[in-house]
Amino acid sequence: MEAGPWRVSAPPSGPPQFPAVVPGPSLEVARAHMLALGPQQLLAQDEEGDTLLHLFAARGLRWAAYAAAEVLQVYRRLDIREHKGKTPLLVAAAANQPLIVEDLLNLGAEPNAADHQGRSVLHVAATYGLPGVLLAVLNSGVQVDLEARDFEGLTPLHTAILALNVAMRPSDLCPRVLSTQARDRLDCVHMLLQMGANHTSQEIKSNKTVLHLAVQAANPTLVQLLLELPRGDLRTFVNMKAHGNTALHMAAALPPGPAQEAIVRHLLAAGADPTLRNLENEQPVHLLRPGPGPEGLRQLLKRSRVAPPGLSS
């Protein structure tokens, strides 16, 4: 880990000064340095609200962070916030420091603390595609709110889906061709689901589920993943409405092409009901764009409307 001594001078009365040389080969050495600094220096905040613990966490200095956190824990300041509302835990998460995240949680950091945007440690991991941070939260064994909402009304799972949509190219029809960034974000989706995130939760602004968000982004890989989840009533899930529109309505309104066709077929196979109408009294078939491209889907949706219910399950 970190190497070399930490030169310590008398504790200043002003903001914390990050040492020119940091500790140390072991936790014991780091503890000795923190003892020499004293609580006044460790509790001090700079002009941006950062403590030394925030700085250690951001730089991945595990033993220094652990030793500093032990001191702040004694003074019940382990969740001290910098100017953007980030606790040391949130800083460690954003810096992709899973070991420090797990250490802070084990020392008693508030797992559901949120910054000034309402983002928890799960939201941060989901936003940046950091499966290691999610694994650290899971390994810590702490109870964390998987349905916490940020100030946009999004759960961590909604956030992970949106982040994955951004990272995936329209041509990414198969997980085998995903970029490293997209793969990490897909792993976050998998992990949140495994941790128990509710895939039927609707975001607050427009009532979209993660399925609506995946369809809206023309992401057939993600649509298929969500439709293969083992728990819950699949037919009810696939027919949930967002401001009157089912996922099938949204799929029908997509630009024509292979992604649209794959999504429509996935939805129909999962029990999507093409007879449902939105607030404008439209069925999905009415939302297909004109032209020869969608004609096959037009016929498919019309046939599905008269097929026995058992054939679409």
UniProtKB/Swiss-Prot annotation:
UniProt cross-references to Gene3D superfamilies, sorted A to Z: Ankyrin repeat-containing domain
Record's GO cellular component terms: nucleus
Residue stretches of each ANK repeat: 48-83, 84-113, 117-146, 152-201, 206-236, 243-276
Keywords: ANK repeat, Inflammatory response, Nucleus, Repeat
Primary localization class, coarse: nucleus
Any Gene Ontology biological process: T cell receptor signaling pathway
Family matches, as SMART domains: ANK
Subcellular location(s) per record: Nucleus
Alphabetical list of InterPro entries matching this protein: Ankyrin_rpt, Ankyrin_rpt-contain_sf
Domain of life: Eukaryota
Pfam families per record: Ank_2, Ank_5
Binding partners and assembly: Interacts with NFKB1, RELA and RELB; in the nucleus.
Family: Belongs to the NF-kappa-B inhibitor family.
Function: Regulates the expression of IL-2, IL-6, and other cytokines through regulation on NF-kappa-B activity. Functions in the regulation of inflammatory responses. Involved in the induction of T helper 17 cells (Th17) differentiation upon recognition of antigen by T cell antigen receptor (TCR). May also regulate TCR-induced negative selection of thymocytes.
Name this protein carries in UniProt: NF-kappa-B inhibitor delta
Organism: Homo sapiens
